Amino acid sequence: MNNALDVKNLCKTYIVNKRQNNVLKNVNFTIREGEMVAVMGPSGSGKSTLLYTVSGMDSITAGDSMFYGKNIGELNVNALADLRLDDMGFIFQQMYMLKNLTVVDNIILPAYQSKKGDESRKKILRRGQDLMRKLGIIEISDNDINEVSGGQLQRACICRSMINNPKMIFADEPTGALNRTASDEVMSELIKINLEGTTIMLVTHDVKVAAKCSRVLYIVDGNIKGEYNLDNAGSDIRPIERERELNNWLMEMGW
């Protein structure tokens, strides 16, 4: 199995009030194709910074982030923008959508900017509607953004992240703003996407969410302190035991 993401000696430093803040310190890890990997750790440990940096949404201070063999840090601005648009999908805790567009128009917007192919609006719209149907939200296709629930909106964000058929999805607290029912529904959809072959890296503070992944990385003070291997992502085998075992391991890590 090939590596989707290969991170070596990654460092990220910010200068705040003329003082150096080393947020990531020689981080090393890999994510294989088809994996669904969670990143956990205390608040301020560098979880989100790690996700933003390895995906090229934030600059790398030192080290390498290899995305399917391409060095993120060596790409120019245009090449990096094209890579993120065509081969990466992004989901965030804050569900950003343009309020002057319908739900489906928000979902298909990235397809107009993609260089994967020159498609007609009809074909792009059909693909967006197919994704909405797949995720069970086709009924809100023509709704305004303020007319849908948080759970529906996050599923729409998943559709948008998939519109260009990305190789990998990066999700920062994708269930953080949702209640438990909506959270479970969103995770079920992400698991389905993963089982179809899309690699996923997600940041979460929720043990229940992380226990649905195939592997968990634990970061403390900008360093990967350990990793925990689970069964296949989304496995229904021993779900309660998976959560308990993961929670016990996190406690050992200092959670």
Question: How should each PLM-predicted stretch be described?
Answer:
Residues 40-42:
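The feature captures the beta-strand-to-loop junction immediately N-terminal to the Walker
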Residues 63-71:
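Conserved ABC transporter NBD signature motif
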Residues 71, 120-139:
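Conserved ABC ATPase "signature" region
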Residues 101-110:
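Short coil-to-helix segment of the ABC ATPase nucleotide-binding domain corresponding to the Q-loop/switch region
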Residues 144-148, 152:
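Conserved ABC ATPase signature
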Residues 161-162:
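ABC ATPase C-loop
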Residues 165:
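Conserved catalytic motifs of ABC-family nucleotide-binding domains
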Residues 169-172:
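Catalytic Walker B motif of ABC-type/P-loop ATPase nucleotide-binding domains
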